[in-house]
Amino acid sequence: MPEDNILTPSGWIRGRLVHEHGKVVAIEGTPCDPADNDLPYLLPGFIDLHVHGGGGADIMEGAQAFETITRTHVRFGTTSLLATTMTAPVDEISQVLSELGSFCEQRPAGSARVLGVHLEGPYINPGKLGAQPNFAHTALMAEVEAYLRLAPIRVITIAPEIAGHDGLIRALSERGVRMQIGHTLGSYEEGVAALAAGATSFTHLYNAMSPLHHREPGIVGAALAHAQYAELIPDLLHVHPGAMRVALRSIPCLYCVTDSTAAAGMPDGEYKLGSHTVTKCLGGVRLADGTLAGSTLTMDQALRNLVKIGLPISEASQRLSQFPADYLGLEERGRLQPGSFADCVRLDRSLILTDVMVEGDTIDFKNA
């Protein structure tokens, strides 16, 4: 590989990354300050824990959509992701999970790695659906058990205020499922109680949850006061830059996601989001009533947006790679060091993506 400014856990190295059999074996070079040279940046590949679609395809469309989605997102530097479902009837969710279970066992050439599933709904508050279809219902352990047998579900979004959900949070978190608070009308107290029961993060912080008020802190207040992790959509549409800065100061391991829809990587027009039809225009995706419906954000643009609001490149990278990996307990992803997967992205000095590598394989995304 050519010489780069390589971001490692111990800082910047001017040098070369050496990899074999999909893993980093060495990083050769010397410590540096990228400001002292004009070399490109080599960063860990982006890890997106909230992906509904891309390239015109939607996860809920099933197996025929998965390769399109993973090939689309790898073009923008996402080297691994969680396939994220929508609220839907039980049989539809079961079918998609069954197909995802098989897909997670492979990685087609030229694609990002699917690390597992983020089940966003149906265990959410029907009063805070956002862009979710109206199939929300109370969680039943037998139903969740059936889902878990179909696919590697890593994350479940849940509204903690619904009766019985506190016990589910406790039981599933003990089994290693990351339980996230989201699509909720819960109070501050209910948010804090959910964290105590084992919830570990918040789904698209600020969006589709009870807001912060100085006498009713709400779920947002619980996150800002107590969370170690939370996801946030940094498209500069879903969350004001000022609110982003508040979260960055308050939540140590805040990480960023796209919450991308089928419209990601596509021109303006109409696309599917679960059972909804959404419209991409003016840089966003909306339902017919104007409600924001996921995003068209890509992770390379997320990096540029974080730098735009004042984060150094190293911290922006951390919130797109290392923190998502840490959240899922993935020690071999999200950082560039010997023993880690050779997942990396090269960007020029304007932060434009020029090269992507997934598990040591160079992606020919320019001709995709």
Question: Where do the model's predicted regions map?
Answer:
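C-terminal cap of metal-dependent C-N hydrolases
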Residues: 4, 326, 335-368
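Divalent metal-dependent hydrolysis catalytic cores, especially in the metallo-beta-lactamase
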Residues: 52, 67-96, 112-125, 151-161, ...
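Active-site loop-to-helix "anion-binding N-cap" substructures in soluble metabolic enzymes
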Residues: 46, 53-59, 82-92, 208-224
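Active-site core of metal-dependent hydrolases
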Residues: 148-268
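His/Asp/Glu-enriched, well-ordered alpha-helical/loop segment
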Residues: 219-229, 249-258, 263-340, 344-347
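N-terminal metal-binding scaffold of metallo-dependent hydrolase/deaminase domains
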Residues: 1-31, 357, 361, 366
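Active-site gating loops and adjacent loop-to-helix segments of metal-dependent hydrolytic enzymes
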Residues: 71-82, 126-150, 193-205, 219-229, ...
